[in-house]
Protein backbone atom coordinates (compact mmCIF):
# COMPACT_ATOMS: atom_id res chain seq x y z
CA UNK A 1 0.00 0.00 0.00
CA UNK A 2 1.49 3.31 -1.04
CA UNK A 3 1.71 6.17 1.47
CA UNK A 4 -1.06 8.26 -0.18
CA UNK A 5 -3.41 5.25 0.09
CA UNK A 6 -2.41 4.38 3.65
CA UNK A 7 -5.26 4.86 6.16
CA UNK A 8 -4.73 7.93 8.33
CA UNK A 9 -4.25 7.25 12.04
CA UNK A 10 -5.90 9.32 14.76
CA UNK A 11 -2.66 9.20 16.76
CA UNK A 12 -0.53 10.41 13.83
CA UNK A 13 1.71 13.24 15.06
CA UNK A 14 2.07 14.77 11.59
CA UNK A 15 -0.83 16.71 10.10
CA UNK A 16 -3.62 14.71 8.47
CA UNK A 17 -6.89 15.60 6.79
CA UNK A 18 -9.25 17.47 9.10
CA UNK A 19 -6.51 19.05 11.21
CA UNK A 20 -7.34 22.49 9.79
CA UNK A 21 -9.96 22.68 12.54
CA UNK A 22 -7.19 22.86 15.15
CA UNK A 23 -6.59 26.49 14.18
CA UNK A 24 -9.81 27.44 16.00
CA UNK A 25 -8.46 26.28 19.37
CA UNK A 26 -4.87 27.51 19.09
CA UNK A 27 -3.64 29.91 21.78
CA UNK A 28 -3.01 33.47 20.65
CA UNK A 29 -0.47 34.62 23.25
CA UNK A 30 2.30 33.27 25.45
CA UNK A 31 0.00 33.66 28.44
CA UNK A 32 -2.50 31.27 26.83
CA UNK A 33 0.15 28.81 25.65
CA UNK A 34 0.19 25.77 27.93
CA UNK A 35 3.30 23.68 28.56
CA UNK A 36 6.89 24.16 27.34
CA UNK A 37 7.59 26.31 30.40
CA UNK A 38 11.28 26.92 29.76
CA UNK A 39 10.69 27.75 26.10
CA UNK A 40 7.90 30.17 27.01
CA UNK A 41 9.87 31.91 29.73
CA UNK A 42 12.97 32.35 27.58
CA UNK A 43 10.97 33.59 24.61
CA UNK A 44 9.12 36.06 26.80
CA UNK A 45 12.40 37.57 28.00
CA UNK A 46 13.87 37.78 24.49
CA UNK A 47 10.68 39.36 23.11
CA UNK A 48 10.55 41.95 25.87
CA UNK A 49 14.21 42.81 25.27
CA UNK A 50 13.69 43.21 21.52
CA UNK A 51 10.62 45.39 22.02
CA UNK A 52 12.46 47.52 24.58
CA UNK A 53 15.32 48.14 22.13
CA UNK A 54 12.90 48.55 19.20
CA UNK A 55 14.89 45.95 17.28
CA UNK A 56 14.02 42.79 15.41
CA UNK A 57 14.10 39.66 17.54
CA UNK A 58 17.11 37.43 16.87
CA UNK A 59 16.44 34.46 14.58
CA UNK A 60 14.70 31.53 16.31
CA UNK A 61 15.03 27.81 15.61
CA UNK A 62 12.27 25.57 17.01
CA UNK A 63 13.00 21.86 16.87
CA UNK A 64 11.36 18.73 18.25
CA UNK A 65 8.81 16.05 17.34
CA UNK A 66 5.81 17.00 15.19
CA UNK A 67 2.59 18.29 16.72
CA UNK A 68 4.06 20.09 19.74
CA UNK A 69 3.13 23.65 18.73
CA UNK A 70 6.06 25.01 16.72
CA UNK A 71 3.82 26.74 14.16
CA UNK A 72 1.57 28.10 16.91
CA UNK A 73 4.57 29.44 18.82
CA UNK A 74 5.89 31.17 15.69
CA UNK A 75 2.54 32.92 15.22
CA UNK A 76 2.53 33.94 18.87
CA UNK A 77 6.01 35.46 18.50
CA UNK A 78 4.70 37.74 15.75
CA UNK A 79 1.64 38.71 17.79
CA UNK A 80 3.70 39.44 20.91
CA UNK A 81 6.03 41.62 18.84
CA UNK A 82 3.03 43.24 17.11
CA UNK A 83 4.54 42.70 13.66
CA UNK A 84 3.54 40.97 10.43
CA UNK A 85 3.71 37.21 9.97
CA UNK A 86 4.59 35.35 6.77
CA UNK A 87 4.61 31.55 6.63
CA UNK A 88 6.07 29.10 4.13
CA UNK A 89 7.90 25.76 4.16
CA UNK A 90 11.26 24.48 2.98
CA UNK A 91 10.01 22.37 0.04
CA UNK A 92 7.97 25.31 -1.33
CA UNK A 93 11.07 27.52 -1.72
CA UNK A 94 12.42 25.75 -4.78
CA UNK A 95 14.81 28.42 -6.08
CA UNK A 96 16.57 31.61 -5.03
CA UNK A 97 13.92 33.77 -6.70
CA UNK A 98 11.21 32.32 -4.45
CA UNK A 99 13.17 33.28 -1.35
CA UNK A 100 13.97 36.73 -2.75
CA UNK A 101 10.26 37.38 -3.35
CA UNK A 102 9.47 36.52 0.27
CA UNK A 103 12.28 38.57 1.78
CA UNK A 104 11.78 41.70 -0.30
CA UNK A 105 8.10 41.88 0.69
CA UNK A 106 8.81 41.88 4.43
CA UNK A 107 8.24 45.00 6.51
CA UNK A 108 10.73 46.04 9.24
CA UNK A 109 10.81 43.56 12.16
CA UNK A 110 8.36 41.14 10.47
CA UNK A 111 8.48 37.43 11.29
CA UNK A 112 9.16 34.98 8.45
CA UNK A 113 8.29 31.40 9.42
CA UNK A 114 9.84 28.52 7.45
CA UNK A 115 8.48 25.11 8.40
CA UNK A 116 10.55 22.02 7.56
CA UNK A 117 13.56 24.28 7.20
CA UNK A 118 15.84 21.24 6.96
CA UNK A 119 14.43 20.65 3.47
CA UNK A 120 15.80 23.89 1.98
CA UNK A 121 17.98 23.28 -1.06
CA UNK A 122 21.71 24.17 -0.80
CA UNK A 123 21.29 26.93 -3.40
CA UNK A 124 18.53 28.59 -1.38
CA UNK A 125 20.54 28.25 1.84
CA UNK A 126 23.46 30.12 0.30
CA UNK A 127 21.16 33.05 -0.44
CA UNK A 128 19.69 32.91 3.05
CA UNK A 129 23.02 33.23 4.92
CA UNK A 130 23.74 36.93 4.14
CA UNK A 131 20.04 37.73 4.51
CA UNK A 132 20.09 36.41 8.08
CA UNK A 133 23.46 37.89 9.06
CA UNK A 134 23.61 41.23 7.26
CA UNK A 135 20.02 41.72 6.04
CA UNK A 136 21.29 41.78 2.48
CA UNK A 137 20.33 39.74 -0.54
CA UNK A 138 22.99 38.86 -3.11
CA UNK A 139 21.54 37.78 -6.46
CA UNK A 140 23.03 36.96 -9.85
CA UNK A 141 21.15 38.65 -12.69
CA UNK A 142 21.52 37.31 -16.22
CA UNK A 143 23.59 34.43 -17.56
CA UNK A 144 27.02 33.90 -19.05
CA UNK A 145 29.29 36.90 -19.72
CA UNK A 146 26.39 39.30 -19.14
CA UNK A 147 25.72 38.02 -15.63
CA UNK A 148 26.18 40.52 -12.82
CA UNK A 149 25.80 40.51 -9.07
CA UNK A 150 23.14 42.67 -7.46
CA UNK A 151 22.95 43.41 -3.74
CA UNK A 152 19.58 44.31 -2.24
CA UNK A 153 19.23 45.74 1.26
CA UNK A 154 16.53 44.10 3.36
CA UNK A 155 14.65 45.46 6.38
CA UNK A 156 15.61 43.85 9.70
CA UNK A 157 13.44 40.76 10.16
CA UNK A 158 13.15 37.67 12.33
CA UNK A 159 13.41 34.23 10.77
CA UNK A 160 11.68 31.49 12.75
CA UNK A 161 12.65 28.07 11.47
CA UNK A 162 10.92 24.86 12.53
CA UNK A 163 12.09 21.30 12.04
CA UNK A 164 11.35 17.81 13.30
CA UNK A 165 14.80 16.64 12.18
CA UNK A 166 17.38 19.05 13.52
CA UNK A 167 20.21 16.69 12.63
CA UNK A 168 19.56 17.37 8.94
CA UNK A 169 20.10 21.12 9.29
CA UNK A 170 23.51 22.12 7.99
CA UNK A 171 25.95 23.55 10.51
CA UNK A 172 26.29 26.97 8.78
CA UNK A 173 22.51 27.43 8.87
CA UNK A 174 22.18 26.22 12.46
CA UNK A 175 24.87 28.64 13.66
CA UNK A 176 22.95 31.63 12.29
CA UNK A 177 20.07 31.09 14.70
CA UNK A 178 20.70 33.05 17.87
CA UNK A 179 17.80 31.44 19.78
CA UNK A 180 17.61 27.64 19.42
CA UNK A 181 14.70 26.17 21.39
CA UNK A 182 13.88 22.49 21.83
CA UNK A 183 10.22 21.46 22.19
CA UNK A 184 9.51 18.55 24.54
CA UNK A 185 6.61 16.10 24.79
CA UNK A 186 3.84 17.26 27.13
CA UNK A 187 2.89 15.76 30.48
CA UNK A 188 -0.68 14.40 30.83
CA UNK A 189 -1.54 17.20 33.28
CA UNK A 190 -0.50 19.82 30.71
CA UNK A 191 -2.48 18.11 27.98
CA UNK A 192 -5.47 17.94 30.32
CA UNK A 193 -5.46 21.75 30.49
CA UNK A 194 -5.12 21.95 26.69
CA UNK A 195 -8.02 19.53 26.18
CA UNK A 196 -10.20 21.37 28.70
CA UNK A 197 -9.49 24.68 26.97
CA UNK A 198 -10.32 23.17 23.58
CA UNK A 199 -13.58 21.75 24.92
CA UNK A 200 -14.63 25.18 26.19
CA UNK A 201 -13.91 26.76 22.81
CA UNK A 202 -15.86 23.99 21.04
CA UNK A 203 -18.81 24.42 23.42
CA UNK A 204 -18.41 20.89 24.78
CA UNK A 205 -19.29 19.95 28.37
CA UNK A 206 -16.26 17.92 29.45
CA UNK A 207 -15.38 16.96 33.02
CA UNK A 208 -11.85 17.20 34.38
CA UNK A 209 -11.60 13.42 34.49
CA UNK A 210 -12.83 13.22 30.91
CA UNK A 211 -10.16 15.70 29.81
CA UNK A 212 -7.48 13.68 31.62
CA UNK A 213 -8.67 10.47 29.96
CA UNK A 214 -8.21 12.05 26.53
CA UNK A 215 -4.88 13.56 27.57
CA UNK A 216 -3.45 10.21 28.68
CA UNK A 217 -4.13 8.71 25.26
CA UNK A 218 -2.68 11.63 23.28
CA UNK A 219 0.99 10.54 23.12
CA UNK A 220 2.18 13.71 24.81
CA UNK A 221 1.18 15.69 21.70
CA UNK A 222 -1.34 18.58 21.59
CA UNK A 223 -2.16 17.93 17.93
CA UNK A 224 -3.21 14.37 18.76
CA UNK A 225 -5.13 15.61 21.81
CA UNK A 226 -7.11 18.07 19.70
CA UNK A 227 -7.87 15.40 17.13
CA UNK A 228 -9.07 12.91 19.75
CA UNK A 229 -11.14 15.63 21.43
CA UNK A 230 -13.03 16.35 18.20
CA UNK A 231 -13.72 12.66 17.60
CA UNK A 232 -14.94 12.18 21.18
CA UNK A 233 -17.24 15.17 20.68
CA UNK A 234 -18.65 13.55 17.52
CA UNK A 235 -19.28 10.16 19.12
CA UNK A 236 -20.71 11.49 22.38
CA UNK A 237 -22.80 14.09 20.56
CA UNK A 238 -24.45 11.48 18.36
CA UNK A 239 -25.01 9.32 21.47
CA UNK A 240 -26.86 12.25 23.05
CA UNK A 241 -24.50 12.72 25.99
CA UNK A 242 -24.77 16.25 27.40
CA UNK A 243 -21.75 15.81 29.67
CA UNK A 244 -18.66 13.81 28.72
CA UNK A 245 -16.97 12.17 31.69
CA UNK A 246 -14.02 9.77 31.89
CA UNK A 247 -16.16 6.72 31.13
CA UNK A 248 -17.74 8.33 28.07
CA UNK A 249 -14.40 9.63 26.76
CA UNK A 250 -12.70 6.30 27.40
CA UNK A 251 -15.50 4.40 25.70
CA UNK A 252 -15.33 6.65 22.64
CA UNK A 253 -11.57 6.27 22.33
CA UNK A 254 -11.72 2.51 22.84
CA UNK A 255 -14.24 2.44 20.01
CA UNK A 256 -11.62 4.27 17.93
CA UNK A 257 -9.09 1.57 18.94
CA UNK A 258 -6.90 3.98 20.91
CA UNK A 259 -6.01 2.35 24.23
CA UNK A 260 -5.08 3.86 27.60
CA UNK A 261 -1.42 4.23 26.63
CA UNK A 262 -2.17 5.93 23.32
CA UNK A 263 -1.39 2.91 21.16
CA UNK A 264 -3.68 2.16 18.23
CA UNK A 265 -4.41 -0.92 16.13
CA UNK A 266 -1.35 -0.34 13.91
CA UNK A 267 0.97 -0.22 16.92
CA UNK A 268 -0.46 -3.46 18.26
CA UNK A 269 -0.25 -5.12 14.85
CA UNK A 270 3.42 -4.12 14.61
CA UNK A 271 4.25 -5.51 18.05
CA UNK A 272 2.25 -8.69 17.42
CA UNK A 273 4.08 -9.25 14.15
CA UNK A 274 7.46 -9.21 15.92
CA UNK A 275 6.23 -11.39 18.79
CA UNK A 276 4.25 -13.97 16.81
CA UNK A 277 6.14 -14.18 13.52
CA UNK A 278 9.73 -13.54 14.59
CA UNK A 279 9.92 -14.75 18.18
CA UNK A 280 10.28 -11.24 19.55
CA UNK A 281 13.18 -10.35 17.28
CA UNK A 282 15.68 -9.23 16.34
CA UNK A 283 14.16 -8.70 12.90
CA UNK A 284 15.07 -6.18 10.21
CA UNK A 285 12.80 -3.28 9.36
CA UNK A 286 12.63 -4.24 5.67
CA UNK A 287 11.36 -7.67 6.67
CA UNK A 288 8.77 -6.08 8.95
CA UNK A 289 7.71 -3.71 6.19
CA UNK A 290 7.13 -6.62 3.82
CA UNK A 291 5.19 -8.55 6.46
CA UNK A 292 2.99 -5.56 7.34
CA UNK A 293 2.62 -4.16 3.83
CA UNK A 294 4.22 -0.85 4.83
CA UNK A 295 7.22 1.05 3.55
CA UNK A 296 10.35 1.35 5.69
CA UNK A 297 10.04 5.10 6.21
CA UNK A 298 6.45 4.71 7.43
CA UNK A 299 7.59 2.29 10.13
CA UNK A 300 10.64 4.36 11.12
CA UNK A 301 8.92 7.75 11.19
CA UNK A 302 5.33 7.12 12.30
CA UNK A 303 5.17 3.85 14.24
CA UNK A 304 8.50 3.10 15.89
CA UNK A 305 9.34 6.43 17.62
CA UNK A 306 6.51 6.27 20.17
CA UNK A 307 7.04 2.55 20.80
CA UNK A 308 10.73 3.21 21.49
CA UNK A 309 9.95 6.25 23.65
CA UNK A 310 7.57 4.17 25.77
CA UNK A 311 10.15 1.38 26.11
CA UNK A 312 8.27 -1.34 24.22
CA UNK A 313 10.71 -1.61 21.32
CA UNK A 314 14.48 -1.55 20.99
CA UNK A 315 16.64 -0.90 17.94
CA UNK A 316 19.75 -3.09 17.94
CA UNK A 317 22.53 -3.67 15.36
CA UNK A 318 20.66 -6.82 14.36
CA UNK A 319 17.21 -5.29 14.00
CA UNK A 320 14.07 -4.57 16.02
CA UNK A 321 13.63 -6.33 19.34
CA UNK A 322 10.70 -6.41 21.75
CA UNK A 323 11.58 -5.35 25.29
CA UNK A 324 10.21 -6.98 28.41
CA UNK A 325 7.70 -4.12 28.60
CA UNK A 326 6.63 -4.89 25.05
CA UNK A 327 5.95 -8.51 25.97
CA UNK A 328 4.00 -7.49 29.07
CA UNK A 329 1.93 -5.01 27.03
CA UNK A 330 0.91 -7.89 24.74
CA UNK A 331 0.12 -10.07 27.74
CA UNK A 332 3.04 -12.41 27.02
CA UNK A 333 5.79 -13.57 29.40
CA UNK A 334 9.22 -12.08 28.62
CA UNK A 335 11.78 -14.62 27.36
CA UNK A 336 14.60 -15.92 29.52
CA UNK A 337 17.34 -13.38 30.18
CA UNK A 338 20.29 -15.39 28.70
CA UNK A 339 18.63 -15.58 25.29
CA UNK A 340 18.00 -11.85 25.31
CA UNK A 341 21.61 -11.14 26.18
CA UNK A 342 22.75 -13.34 23.28
CA UNK A 343 20.55 -11.37 20.88
CA UNK A 344 21.89 -8.03 22.08
CA UNK A 345 25.48 -9.24 21.74
CA UNK A 346 24.91 -10.29 18.15
CA UNK A 347 24.31 -14.03 18.54
CA UNK A 348 21.81 -15.94 16.45
CA UNK A 349 18.34 -15.10 17.68
CA UNK A 350 14.82 -16.39 17.22
CA UNK A 351 14.19 -13.88 14.43
CA UNK A 352 16.52 -15.80 12.14
CA UNK A 353 18.97 -12.89 11.86
CA UNK A 354 22.18 -12.94 9.87
CA UNK A 355 25.68 -12.16 11.16
CA UNK A 356 26.38 -8.46 11.55
CA UNK A 357 27.36 -6.89 8.24
CA UNK A 358 25.31 -9.36 6.20
CA UNK A 359 21.88 -8.09 7.21
CA UNK A 360 20.16 -5.79 4.75
CA UNK A 361 17.62 -3.96 6.79
CA UNK A 362 18.55 -3.16 10.36
Swiss-Prot record:
Q: Which residues bind ATP?
A: 25-26, 67, 70-72, 133-135, 176, 186, 223
For the protein in the UniProt heading, the enzyme class is hydrolase
Instruction: List the catalytic activities from the record.
Output: ATP + H2O = ADP + phosphate + H(+)
Q: Which SMART domains match?
A: AAA
The coiled-coil regions, if any, are: none
Pfam families reported for this sequence: AAA_lid_4, RuvB_C, RuvB_N
Q: Which InterPro entries match?
A: AAA+_ATPase (IPR003593), AAA_lid_4 (IPR041445), DNA_helicase_Holl-junc_RuvB (IPR004605), P-loop_NTPase (IPR027417), RuvB-like_N (IPR008824), RuvB_C (IPR008823), WH-like_DNA-bd_sf (IPR036388), WH_DNA-bd_sf (IPR036390)
Endpoints of the signal sequence: none
Q: Give residues annotated as binding DNA.
A: 296, 315, 320
**Which GO molecular function annotations are given, in alphabetical order?**
ATP binding; ATP hydrolysis activity; four-way junction DNA binding; four-way junction helicase activity
EC number of the protein: 3.6.4.-
Q: Which domain of life is it from?
A: Bacteria
Give Gene Ontology CC terms.
cytoplasm; Holliday junction resolvase complex
Where are the stretches annotated Small ATPAse domain (RuvB-S)?
A: 187-257
Q: According to its UniProt record, which protein family does this protein belong to? A: Belongs to the RuvB family.
Query: Any idea what job this protein has?
Result: The RuvA-RuvB-RuvC complex processes Holliday junction (HJ) DNA during genetic recombination and DNA repair, while the RuvA-RuvB complex plays an important role in the rescue of blocked DNA replication forks via replication fork reversal (RFR). RuvA specifically binds to HJ cruciform DNA, conferring on it an open structure. The RuvB hexamer acts as an ATP-dependent pump, pulling dsDNA into and through the RuvAB complex. RuvB forms 2 homohexamers on either side of HJ DNA bound by 1 or 2 RuvA tetramers; 4 subunits per hexamer contact DNA at a time.
The Swiss-Prot or TrEMBL note on domains reads:
Has 3 domains, the large (RuvB-L) and small ATPase (RuvB-S) domains and the C-terminal head (RuvB-H) domain. The head domain binds DNA, while the ATPase domains jointly bind ATP, ADP or are empty depending on the state of the subunit in the translocation cycle. During a single DNA translocation step the structure of each domain remains the same, but their relative positions change.
Protein name, per record: Holliday junction branch migration complex subunit RuvB
Taxonomy, top ranks, is: Bacteria, Pseudomonadati, Pseudomonadota, Alphaproteobacteria, Rhodospirillales
Amino acid sequence: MSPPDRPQRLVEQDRIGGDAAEASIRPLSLAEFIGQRQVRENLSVFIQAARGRKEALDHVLLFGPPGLGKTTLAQIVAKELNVGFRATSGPVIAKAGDLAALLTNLQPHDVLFIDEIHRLSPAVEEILYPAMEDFQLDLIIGEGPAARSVRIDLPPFTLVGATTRSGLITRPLRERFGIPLRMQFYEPEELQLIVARGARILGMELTGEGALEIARRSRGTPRVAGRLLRRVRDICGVAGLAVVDAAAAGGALTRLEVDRLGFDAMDRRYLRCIADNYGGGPVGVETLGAALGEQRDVLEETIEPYLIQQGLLQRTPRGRLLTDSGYRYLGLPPPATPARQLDLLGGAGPGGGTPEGEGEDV
